[in-house]
Amino acid sequence: METDRRAFLRVAGSSLVLGAGSVWTAAAQAQALPVSFPGIPNPLEGGVDVIATGYIWTEGPVWVGGEDGHLLFSDVPGNAIYSWDGKRTTAFLAPSGYQGFPIPASLREAGSNGLALGRGGLLIADSGTRALARVDLATRQRTVFAESYQGKRFNSPNDLVVARNGAVYFTDPPFGLAGVQNSPLRELTFTGVFRVTTDNQVHLVTDKLSPNGIALSPDNRILYATDTSGWVAIDLDASGMPAGQRQFVASDKVGGARGDGMKADSAGNIWTSGRGGIYVFSPKGEHIGFIPIAGRVSNCAFGPDRYLYVTNDTQVVRGRIRAEFPGGSAIRY
């Protein structure tokens, strides 16, 4: 079974060498087969437009501020976070993960991955440092606030989401390490989903998944995670810890697609990347929308004016969500 996040989206026979300094070639992108779901509507008013390009592997988009805000996103192997202000893209934080040079061969992805707003700043799943960190949006100073569980270092934190009470949930696969599951750097024997409290206590939510992306329902009572089986829902109790786990959407229900990053909208729908584009599932797990996007899609984020921003291989694209689509008139960002 392939464990590489990008292998989830790869068609049989494709071959890419991944790691710091590697590039995604146009030929490799062309190997992504087109995907369609007859009868499943496209939630967008039109197609998607490229707003930033020329990166290695984009991830972790998050909108910062209101109507006049900006988009932040990671270039994970490039070890940098970039900002798009509606007109141009500039470097926001480099390095965004591993702080040394040269980057050791033991690290496959040295930079930040998932990004989220919380604790009065920017929170990053730091694949290279193998930790969670807070970045002051004004000074850009980094502060690590979680890096181990029961004395053992995390694998390589991948994605995160912040609860209303300030707790941070995150996934910890080994994708950032050379050798992935076989990396000699691994100290934990499992790939977990964790919860970090506001006083930085780390609690294990589950060690029974091969997790990647993560999202919370609007009421914060359901935690969603991607897995090799598809998408999983974890019911949370009043303390924010698991009360049960169930299959939300099985991979074989959507043509064998497996997810990467995802977001929940204000109606409780889950917008998730997968083979061929963005999939939208209702809170009941019904497949209610699909946005076809060429190349490999890693994650998405909502912004003002109903725009959906998508990290897409070497670039970032965006499209406008139809107001009449379920939840479209009240998308939160």
Per-region residue spans from a language model:
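Bacterial N-terminal signal peptides
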Residues: G13-S22
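Sequence-structural signature of mature extracellular/luminal beta-sheet repeat domains
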Residues: T3, L9, G13, Q29-Y333
